[in-house]
Structure formats: structure tokens, C-alpha cells
Design a protein with these regions (language model features):
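Short, flexible turn/loop "capping" segments at secondary-structure junctions
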Residues: 1-4, 45-46
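Active-site-flanking beta-strand signature of metal-NTP-handling nucleotidyl enzymes
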Residues: 5-10
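Short, surface-exposed ligand-recognition loops at beta-strand->loop->(often short) alpha-helix junctions
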Residues: 12-17
Length: 95
């Protein structure tokens, strides 16, 4: 298996920043408990409070794929278009 690293950047509209921050924060603990999650870190950019960055390591691509189908993510996914200032930027890396 090849370990997978994801670095994702999410930028909120200023008027939806707090709502998005809340939704994103709620994903951290359930995700960390998922099978195959090595680590899952959520950060707010030091210079732009509307910019959120995720750093994730997964045991395999299959584990990441399973994560993206988890029920706890669905409330977030259904709101993204309304909350985001631009599309999510994802860097998909292998170790």
C-alpha cells in the first residue's frame, strides 16, 4: 500500500467564515477515528482567517476514498458551494 497525503485549502466567503469554520471543525474528531487515518490536522491561516488548511495522511488511497463517503462529511459537502469563495484546492501526494 502507498501512503497518501492530502493538503487541502478551503477559502470561505467573509460572510460565511464562522459557519464554515464550525462545519470544518466538526469533521476533525470523527475523521481521526476513521480506519486508515494516520493523522488529520486542521489549521487557520495566520494571515487570512477565511483560509483553512487541512493536512491529512492516510494509510492508502482506499482509506481516503472511504473517508470521502463518510456520513459525517455530507452536511459539509452539501453546503460547500454556498460557503466557499473559490473551489477547494487539493494537493494529492504519495510517500
Amino acid at each position: 500500500m502507498t501512503q497518501v497525503t492530502i493538503i487541502g485549502t478551503v477559502i470561505a466567503k467573509p460572510e460565511t467564515r464562522e459557519e464554515l469554520h464550525c462545519l470544518l471543525s466538526k469533521q476533525v474528531m470523527p475523521t481521526r477515528r476513521e480506519d486508515g487515518c494516520i493523522n488529520y490536522e486542521f489549521h487557520v491561516d495566520a494571515k487570512d482567517s477565511c483560509c483553512f488548511v487541512f493536512y491529512e495522511n492516510w494509510r492508502s488511497q482506499a482509506d481516503l476514498d472511504a473517508h470521502l463517503k463518510m456520513p459525517h462529511l455530507q452536511p459539509l459537502f452539501t453546503q460547500l458551494e454556498r460557503l466557499l469563495a473559490c473551489p477547494v484546492e487539493i494537493h494529492h501526494l504519495h510517500m
